[in-house]
Swiss-Prot record:
Subcellular localization(s) per the UniProt record: Cell membrane
A Pfam match: MIP
Motif (NPA 1): 83-85
Protein name stated in the entry: Probable aquaporin AqpM
Family: Belongs to the MIP/aquaporin (TC 1.A.8) family.
Domain notes: Aquaporins contain two tandem repeats each containing three membrane-spanning domains and a pore-forming loop with the signature motif Asn-Pro-Ala (NPA).
Name of the gene encoding the protein in the UniProt record: aqpM
Cytoplasmic side: 1-12, 78-104, 168-173, 239-246
Species assigned in the record: Archaeoglobus fulgidus (strain ATCC 49558 / DSM 4304 / JCM 9628 / NBRC 100126 / VC-16)
Function: Channel that permits osmotically driven movement of water in both directions.
Length: 246
């Protein structure tokens, strides 16, 4: 059954909301526990500054579960892109209609904004001043080019998995949510301490918007999380398309 664009738009809003509320939300709680929620300080270096592997594993699993939940609950409605880089990559290989790219991306950004703003409303100002709303930024000492490359590599792996388990009609059914979610969790655990491991322009946009309302400005890093994920996702989609052709 073909869903209307309005229904798919709504599903992308809801799906991205779930991703950003629970994924970056887990990063916020981790930072608040580590730093003390009663000691707010201006958050200005992003979650890339988190240290322990245990912290990153916990955050990665929160993302994994949120993504799996979205894919299994909303995937049949909109495809559960919940990521502008995925939408653009699928369009670039002819697997998604061009006329729907902008509506999907708008929906994803709306969902991300709602996720961060409602998390801020639930937790209070410390979610931003201590936890930065889970915003991503390069770890101190990581250059702009290094950060873009890291995000591109991480999103390349994610998109390659998406192509193999969700887009390719030959993929065994029922595993997409689990495999994609665990892939994101693994990538976050691996590169989180370099860039915060966004892999998704919308996932970064939401926290940046919420932080801006609290006087925290990280927008100088936003191009990293647009260029890197889009380049990585498009490259993976084209490579898989080439390799999978019989």
């Amino acid at each position: 059954m073909t869903m209307t664009l309005a229904k798919r738009f709504t599903a992308e809003v809801v799906g991205t909301f779930i991703l950003v509320f629970f994924g970056p939300g887990a990063a916020v709680i981790t930072l608040m526990i580590a730093n003390g929620a009663d000691k707010p300080n201006e958050f200005n270096i992003g979650i890339g500054a988190l240290g322990g592997l245990g912290d990153w594993f916990a955050i990665g699993m929160a993302f994994a579960l949120a993504i799996a939940a979205v894919i299994y609950s909303l995937g049949r409605i909109s495809g559960a892109h919940i990521n502008p880089a995925v939408t653009i990559a699928l369009w670039s290989i002819g697997r998604f209609p061009g006329r729907e790219v902008v509506p999907y991306i708008v929906a994803q950004f709306i969902g991300a904004a709602l996720g961060s703003l409602l998390f801020l409303a639930c937790v209070g100002p410390a979610a931003a001043t201590v936890g930065g709303l889970g915003a991503t930024a390069p770890f101190p000492g990581i250059g702009y080019g290094q950060a873009i490359l890291t995000e591109a590599i991480g999103t390349f792996l994610l998109m390659l998995v998406i192509m193999g388990v969700a887009v390719d009609e030959r993929a065994p059914p029922g595993f997409a949510g689990l495999v994609i979610g665990l892939t994101v969790g693994g990538i976050i655990t691996t590169i989180g301490n370099i860039t915060g491991s966004s892999l998704n322009p919308a996932r970064t946009f939401g926290p940046y918007l919420g932080d801006s309302l609290m006087g925290i400005n990280l927008w100088q890093y936003f191009p990293i999380y647009v260029i890197g994920p889009i380049v990585g996702a498009v490259a993976a989609a084209w490579l898989y398309n080439y390799l999978a052709k019989e």
